[in-house]
Amino acid sequence: MKVTIAHNNYDKTLKTVAYLKEILKKKNVVFDAKYPDVVISVGGDGTLINAFHRYENQVDSVRFIGVHTGHLGFYTDWRNYDIDKMVDALLLTDEAPAKYPLLEIKLITESGETKYHLAVNESAVKRVSHTLEADVYINDELFENFRGDGLCVSTPTGSTAYSKSLGGAVIHPRLKALQMTEIASINNRVFRTLSAPIVIAPDQWITIVPNADHFVMTVDGARIDVRNAKKIEYRISHHSIQFDQFGHHHFWSRVQDAFIGENNSND
């Protein structure tokens, strides 16, 4: 087994990483940052998502483990005080990994060039200082003419992130569905949109055709300035992000822990 560690640079994280490296070396674990079997992310969700994008070209052969050292971690199963237990489980457990759907993004330019991206959580299309005007298609059939600040397309696990703050539903990852949420849509006698999140089946796709030469597309929060784009296609990828399943909390436990916490009722 070949392992690498991805981490942020906070003091608490660096102390955890130093201890983790010490334990792994004692267990004679091989470190390989180029072609790892397992990526251990120490920090928070942002650290893990950055680690995914670093190894997304190896997504079918890499598994992820998240160690949480901050205040909130949706993708992190272990705490910094669980390092010994986590390493023992890593070396002794041979369970099939838990798999979560990924978002495939296909950006097609006016010249016919195609650029591909993968997202763990979501991708959004926006304009910086102007209203976004875009035609939205589902399975190549026109669905609506959108006017507003932007549009967000998310995975099921991404439904707990930016999409949720936009009023989207929280979707279990086994559904493998896409969700599109509107960002401050304009609705009046001239412009009409659905003004509600939509959820589509895993064998369907969403196409956004912006009526602008220049706009911003985000992929898991990373900004991409886009010029001369013809359209953007979104669908559930045939790839998945894989998490080692030992100690893996089920989806609704993660949601409850992240957004509700302990029951503080005085009853």
Curated annotation (Swiss-Prot):
Transmembrane segments: none annotated. GO terms for biological process: NAD metabolic process; NADP biosynthetic process. It is found in: Cytoplasm. Gene3D superfamilies: Probable inorganic polyphosphate/atp-NAD kinase, domain 1 (3.40.50.10330), Probable inorganic polyphosphate/atp-NAD kinase, domain 2 (2.60.200.30). The active site is at D45 (proton acceptor). Its EC number is 2.7.1.23. Pfam families: NAD_kinase, NAD_kinase_C. Its cofactor is a divalent metal cation. NAD(+) binds at D45, G46, N121, E122, R147, D149, T160, A161, Y162, S163, K164, S165, A184. The keyword Zinc-finger does not apply. Involved in the regulation of the intracellular balance of NAD and NADP, and is a key enzyme in the biosynthesis of NADP. Catalyzes specifically the phosphorylation on 2'-hydroxyl of the adenosine moiety of NAD to yield NADP. Belongs to the NAD kinase family. HAMAP family: NAD_kinase. This is NAD kinase. The gene is nadK.
